[in-house]
């Protein structure tokens, strides 16, 4: 059978399962593909295939992640599931699998556990915007009051981390029943169908990169005699058109300039779009006014900052990271988009040191400004060697 063509007509949404070990994330993932294949006609992926997730590298960090896809009536979903807790931590911090929404799987028989809490916190830190809850293994709970209690606990936990706990949709069911094609008390296939409908209605369609305000990290600067200065890079989002006013942000004071041409593969174009590698010709900007590591943006859309809180994963020795812990006052380089900037690390109160393989919240103060927004990913390096990965959780100044 020929490989089916990717259907671009349905809007594309990225989701993933999160939650404590053995609460049924992978079973639910398999059940979702099964139910959607019966109802909406996408492909089935078996449990074993998801569970033995392949290794992949993101920013030099090895992560095991399973990617499956399924369709609802109105959308195409790309879904990630990780076998181990460490894989979730790395995945969410590196942004290897960006989620537009997460499905929190919590066992109704056990209630919220340490990783339930940790994954909700991580979702908050890395900017997962929406969480839908699937209370799993409900077929093992006879007592309706117990179900209510677990539901209340989960809602409280979500509210603790600034998710709308009271309004979060919670679907009660059994992933295993759905996987086996059963549906007693509508806990099997019906519950999973309801989950998909909830994803459709509760998670808004994400804004496409091309519709966001223009941003291009500057990789290189050239001066072309008689034409002016050209900066090159890959457009991260938005569109740049000839005659657009632009700002150059980061590393020095912000300056304004105008785009007088867009060049791609030696051809002149009227515009450059998200995802394209191109050169942008700037009017009135000297070769020495711009450098790699700055960003070219739509005026007013991004501000330069130096101080922020971050969620960081420190590479283990096996991953090629440090062999020893680091302490407060640690000063590595932070690699944002295209450049390294030195920064100072403040650890949370009561934390003396950070071991390789840990994840930690820290406050970072950079020695130069960087154009940044909440959710921006970075690498931590020592002399060009990656020793950690992080994400901006909240900008301070």
Curated annotation (Swiss-Prot):
Residues 174-176 are annotated as: G5. It is found in: Cytoplasm. Residues 81-84 are annotated as: G3. Residues 10-207 form the tr-type G domain. Residues 136-139 are annotated as: G4. Residues 19-26 are annotated as: G1. InterPro entries: EF-Tu_GTP-bd (IPR041709), EF-Tu_GTPase (IPR050055), EFTu-like_2 (IPR004161), EFTU_2 (IPR033720), G_TR_CS (IPR031157), P-loop_NTPase (IPR027417), Small_GTP-bd (IPR005225), T_Tr_GTP-bd_dom (IPR000795). Mg(2+) binds at residue 26. Residues 60-64 are annotated as: G2. It comes from the Bacteria. Belongs to the TRAFAC class translation factor GTPase superfamily. Classic translation factor GTPase family. EF-Tu/EF-1A subfamily. Monomer. GTP hydrolase that promotes the GTP-dependent binding of aminoacyl-tRNA to the A-site of ribosomes during protein biosynthesis. This is Elongation factor Tu. It comes from Pseudomonas fluorescens (strain Pf0-1). The gene is tuf1.
